[in-house]
Amino acid sequence: MTVHCLGNGKVCVYGRGADIFQAFGPEYSSPDAFTLSVCPEGGVNEPAATVKHSRVCFSHTLGSLKMLDLVPPGSSDFYRAVTGNVRFRLTLKNAPVLDLLSPGTAMAVTEPGAIVYATSFENGRPHGYTSNRFRYILIKTDGDVVLRKTSDTELEIAVSGRGLLSVVFSETPEGLFSERPDPEIGNLMFSYLESPPDASPLKHDPRINPARNLPAAANSPFYKEILDGADVICAQQAETGAVLAGYNYHLSYVRDNYGVFRFFLAAGAYENARRLLAFYMSVFERHGRIQNAQGMSESAFHIHENDRVEITGYLVLMFTAYLRATGDTETVRKALPLIKYCLLSQQTELSTCGTLPFNGDETYIAGGLLPRSAIADGSMEATALFHRAITEALSVPFIKEYLGAGAADLLEAAKALIENRFTANFAGENGLFYCNRPLEDPSEAPLFRPGGVRACGHGFGLSFRNKNGDYVCPACLSLDLPPLFPGLYGKRFAVEAALLSPCFTGSQGLIPEGLTAKAAASVRDSLNSRSRIVGFEYGFLMYGQGFDRGLAELMLAQRDRFGAWSEYYDGGNQAGTLCRPWETAVNLAALIEKYPEE
């Protein structure tokens, strides 16, 4: 079933039909708060017809039963208005239900220690980054509703007529009660729910349908599709500026946010873009580093192999592209320490043959299209990205001045080395161009890694290289484990779709003439026949070959009915995480930026 998302920057809710399976508040990257499901024994056992009204408002119809969900802009509340007879089960995920404060009112307190981001599971229990804050939840019902506590973590909500459920989030008990549900919101929701939506005077009420400011996309023939996709993306943009990577990834992933950032620039949503940059600046100011992913409010990190490469290149390109689009030198000057960190982090990882390794969360590795045995190899994509980042950064006089002559000279030398060796490193026989350059000596791989996937299956974290070259947890290091990737160690891989990544980042000048067009043609021909493709491949292809209407129609046909692309497509069907900002952003940015080339 299609996944949808309501979000206002403070409260984010993911649902399938009328059932809610994740909810976050009073900010994103916080412990999962509750689920809300229709009880089938309550007389309703059919899937809901769900309609999106805006990024903060969805309605559901099940026969004569009508529901409207809303997270009003600027509030820390979630509301569901109901007309009809139905029972719901509300299950709190990280807090017990306190005794009912009064009829129709309950409260829960999530204490410090609740999981924000799980890195592993042992005996069914999650381990990882935990919250260091109290969070308070007020659950209130009004109208023809009976609220009943059925267990330590569950509430039953029985509606027989006209009822309103309100869930209020706060970080303080005082805030919880000072921000009690707004009675006007209930009146607004019932007025909207009980009138034909297209005829309702409330259709354009900013509490139901907040404004969308995408001036650069306004003249696009795909404007409606762009607006739908913008809702998917902006619902998952936190008040802090960063964007979730979807319901399976509750942090801000740099690569995903780079794609989102490109969409913001392409659509002219410069304030959204500036807020995203401000988030990464604030993380760096607090922690002095950027990892593969970071918490949006809590100090949580998803640390992967080789986090000093690839993601650092994306960050540099975000700042230089923003400067070029807006002329906002003030923001970019504030980011100079971060830009320098990103450039020199990559420079220290550059091999003597002019390559950077793979980041452990690189798309084709994460999706299983490249084995994890290749992570320490030279990466065509990361290397080209570093080259582009150097070129862009050194072209801005005040960035070059801040770096200083010594650092600038190091980067110029790195750029020259990459250029001189790039074709030799990645070109092969018969016109093939490879994604990786295997290590000449496997012992060059690091003895341990501070983060990333453990080959032994024991989650993420510190791992050590065993005799097979696989990275395992300390407890498994002395075990006689079989090789995880038999026959794949030291092998070269040619994933043609990966050749299109430099077209997206502007690094295609390093690819030998004609190979990009050849790769694009091959990828285009195989889109319908390959068993698995990544969801942004359509957009990358459009950046590689230019706009064509057939590709645009094929790409748009892969969206779900709310306007989102998924993480992967298996046999043409959505797979992995649905309702994804990154894939949606890349594909829409391509539609905006490449359409004039028709």
Regions found by a protein language model. Name each.
Residues 507-536:
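Generic long, charged, amphipathic alpha-helical segments
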Residues 290-293, 355-358, 375-380, 384-505, ...:
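Catalytic cores of carbohydrate-active enzymes
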Residues 1-31, 35, 295, 302-322, ...:
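C-terminal capping/lid segments that line or modulate ligand- or cofactor-binding pockets
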Residues 209-217, 258-270, 314-331, 385-402, ...:
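Well-ordered alpha-helical scaffold segments within catalytic/enzyme domains
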Residues 250-353, 379-387, 552, 578-596:
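Aromatic-rich carbohydrate-recognition surfaces in CAZymes
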Residues 214-217, 228-252, 262:
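Asp/Glu-centered strand-loop micro-motifs enriched in Gly/Pro and often flanked by an aromatic residue
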Residues 211, 215-229, 280, 285-287, ...:
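Active-site acid/base region of carbohydrate-active enzymes
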Residues 1-218, 255-256, 265-267, 596-598:
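Terminal accessory carbohydrate-recognition/targeting modules of carbohydrate-active enzymes
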